[in-house]
Amino acid sequence: LAQAPFKITRRASREQVSILREFVWLQMLNLGQKVWGIAVSDAHTVFGNGVGGWRTYIPSSSDEPEEIEWEEISRRAKAGQMMLTTGPFLQVSTKDGTLPGGLTRANDSLSLNVGVQCPSWIDIDRVQVLINGRQSSEHNYTRIKHPELFQDGVLKFDQQLTIKLSQDAHIIVVAYGENFDLKTGYGKSSQGTNKPCAYHNPIFIDTDGDGFTPNGDTLGFPIPTAKMSVNAVKEQLSKLNTPTK
């Protein structure tokens, strides 16, 4: 849910440019580059370094480990049917059953089924729909403004949303815990300060019957390049009233 493809961070006493890959990914999708998102994680020390900060979920015909077929997992992964998460379990599909990575046909609106489940030690309080990479104000659901849409059990959110469309689009849903963290699971690890977050690969929508056409929108910023200077990034952020840090 970043507002720019980069930010200024500090390492020791020196400022540096950090690229926000998720934002760049959205820019790439708008330029027609179908790159699937996948989450990976590792550990570098035994103490104080959480393991499995991000995970990737892929649908399977069976929940029994011995019955899971690698051919099916490979096929679904190549099709982009993946959900990325730090904990929340997000499921999104269209009314006709199209999953992330798929292409479906719609006229002026799309029915989207969105479900979010969480274990007892984490929670989410926001569900945001991205339409062509931009955060839709109409589809920004929070516990504060839309308490009737959220629940307190394992199932946190279970709604069918109607998304109005005027052109071809790719849709991504983000489930987020703005007022929560992962400290219960990660303890003293720095990953404990991360937020519960889940999102999925885009669902592509064809509104005019000629397939999906990307809109070319780079979301207000040029695609980041290597060795961008701190001053150049600060200048770009200041022009759009975006915080530099």
Predicted regions and their residues:
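C-terminal functional module detector
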Residues: T9-A12, E22-K245
